[in-house]
Amino acid sequence: MDITVILCTYNRCQSLAKALESLAAQTLPSAVEWEVLVVDNNSKDQTRTVAEDYSRRHPGRFRYLFEPQPGKSHALNAGIRDSHGDIIAFIDDDATAEPTWLQNLTSGLHGNEWAGAGGRIVPAKNISFPRWFPPDEPRLFRTLALFSCGLEPGPLTEPPLGTNMAFRKEMFDRYGGFRTDLGPCPGSEIRGEDTEFGGRILAAGARMRYEPAAIVLHPVSPDRLRKQYFLTWWFDKGRSEFRQFGIPRDATWFVAGVPLSLFRRLARWTLLWILSISPARRFSCRLKVWTLAGQIVESYRHGHSRETVTAS
């Protein structure tokens, strides 16, 4: 088997059907053997019915796997273990892929030059950004699960997002799977399992390629264009960053188990937030404050521990 597409899902049977329909419409050379593995992370809706319907309609192309352990990373790792492909691609259950997505995303991974690849994630519909949104800060688009490094292919210097990425399967054998202390699960929206893995292999010297022609469409609901959504997302991002990187090794002074340097940075960015005149600049500084607050909260919960939770 050449390629396995892993799609993890939880209680999104309606958007799942649209995602699977876009995968059924993929155009790859007839010589390429590929499959879609739907990993159901203990859904309570009609997810299994939808997935098994596609298995019946496209025998040999779609498979269904039930993973009872809550948490997206558990579902991802279960899918990797059950996959048949030498290349593993990932897409989310609320996204749709353009017909040439899989071919463009994986075309450079059949040799040994590239360990993985990532493509563009664009809004499914045109959206109007509010005045407070900083349009010149590409990193903020990640909050909306959007990703672009331009229109030219080339090496990636930052990890792609999980709804449009692929890796040679041997990368998981070499570097481990997705960390199970990261990623959405019931009761927690701490993300980062996708970018942590991509960052892990980039830090190890592996090379990843940006494929702008590999396009995934992702919905951006009005709720995600509200300040509170961004603030919550960046607070959770701070918590995720602390789980990934822990306490800085040069930290020497602590207050209630939290590095004093985090409080200093929090004070500095709070001052910048207060003094900024531009609405976009003010909000950008405010997001940094919320990120640092998330790091402080997570640091307080973990005390002085520098232990890293390994991938399973």
Feature locations, PLM:
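Short, flexible, basic/aromatic active-site loop/helix in glycosyltransferases
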Residues: D136-E158
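Non-catalytic, C-terminal membrane-associated alpha-helical segments of glycosyltransferases
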Residues: T232-R239, G246-S312
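Short, well-formed alpha-helical segments that are part of the catalytic scaffolds
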Residues: R12-Q26
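Glycine-rich, basic loop-to-helix element that forms the pyrophosphate-binding segment
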Residues: E67-S83
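A conserved acidic beta->alpha catalytic loop
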Residues: S22, D40-T49, A95
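Short aromatic/hydrophobic "clamp" motif used to bind/position activated sugar donors
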Residues: I88
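Conserved donor NDP-sugar-binding/catalytic core segment of glycosyltransferases
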Residues: T100-F133
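Acidic donor-binding loop at a coil-to-helix junction in glycosyltransferase catalytic cores
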Residues: P160, P184-F197
